[in-house]
Amino acid sequence: MCGIVGIVSSEDINQQIYDSLLLLQHRGQDSTGIATMEESMFHIYKAKGQVSTAYRTRDMRNLVGKVGLGHVRYATKGSAESIEEAQPFYVNAPYGIVLIHNLSLIHI
């Protein structure tokens, strides 16, 4: 079980994603992450723990963009202590993609 939010707006959305994740906090308390996109550049911040303690002002200032995703994780597989397993995931091939999911992939 996780909490997922996505926003597309004509204005910067980092605060709206943060506020949405606070409302979704009951869906997962192991880690949290936000990814935003400004023009063609992704900005990503991930942390262990709850939303209210994970983000500082300087982190939020770096999450500029009008498109974004947010995630709170309840670890059902893998390690709750691993920041590498916190989402969003970013892959830089061939052009870059940010992914958030709420499922288990088994035997693929």
Can you describe what each PLM-predicted range is?
Residues 106-108:
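Conserved small/polar residues in nucleotide/adenosyl-binding loops
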Residues 1-102:
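N-terminal glutamine amidotransferase
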